[in-house]
């Protein structure tokens, strides 16, 4: 069962845990992956989960449904993505980690894309689509960028769009019935 946003949800920063949190109810708090040093100043005051957040929640839940993730993991992904969209500090592109692809794509917010490094391939969710570069959330466990640098799952990176390729769509498997 998927949780549904409501008027009582509140974003707040927890200094003790150094994390942006989302109060879902009196008994449930979601801890994002993001620390204070990664956040814009407005994240340090309590903010409501607004109508735009709710719209993005439903948009992204529809997009990530094609991932082979459990619903709780999809919700975790989407809430982290909304936190990035709303509270993450602006980033400069770090495209050099990834190889160029041809033809270049122009992704949209919520698109699932792939990017390759010399050490492997990763899947990403586009959080903010730009004309030249987009902010992406890593969906791969500890993607190796270089011999000394990894990008953790839910890590955020801005990349030029010519590094992205569409995520292959899984083909339905049918068995022949006689």
Swiss-Prot record:
Cell compartments where the protein resides: Cytoplasm
Q: What is its main location?
A: cytoplasm
Q: Which UniProt keywords apply?
A: Cell cycle, Cell division, Cytoplasm, Septation
Q: Where is the signal peptide?
A: none
The regions listed as transmembrane in this protein's record are none
Q: Where does the record place a coiled coil?
A: none
Q: Which GO terms describe its biological process?
A: division septum assembly; FtsZ-dependent cytokinesis
Is Signal one of the keywords?
A: no
Alphabetical list of InterPro entries matching this protein: ZapC (IPR009809), ZapC_C (IPR048372), ZapC_N (IPR048373)
Identify one Gene Ontology CC term for this UniProt entry: cytoplasm
Query: Could you describe the subunit structure of this protein?
Result: Interacts directly with FtsZ.
User: Per its database record, what is this protein's job?
Assistant: Contributes to the efficiency of the cell division process by stabilizing the polymeric form of the cell division protein FtsZ. Acts by promoting interactions between FtsZ protofilaments and suppressing the GTPase activity of FtsZ.
* Membership in a protein family: Belongs to the ZapC family.
**Stated name of the protein:** Cell division protein ZapC
Q: Which species is this UniProt entry from? A: Aeromonas hydrophila subsp. hydrophila (strain ATCC 7966 / DSM 30187 / BCRC 13018 / CCUG 14551 / JCM 1027 / KCTC 2358 / NCIMB 9240 / NCTC 8049)
**Gene name for this UniProt entry:** zapC
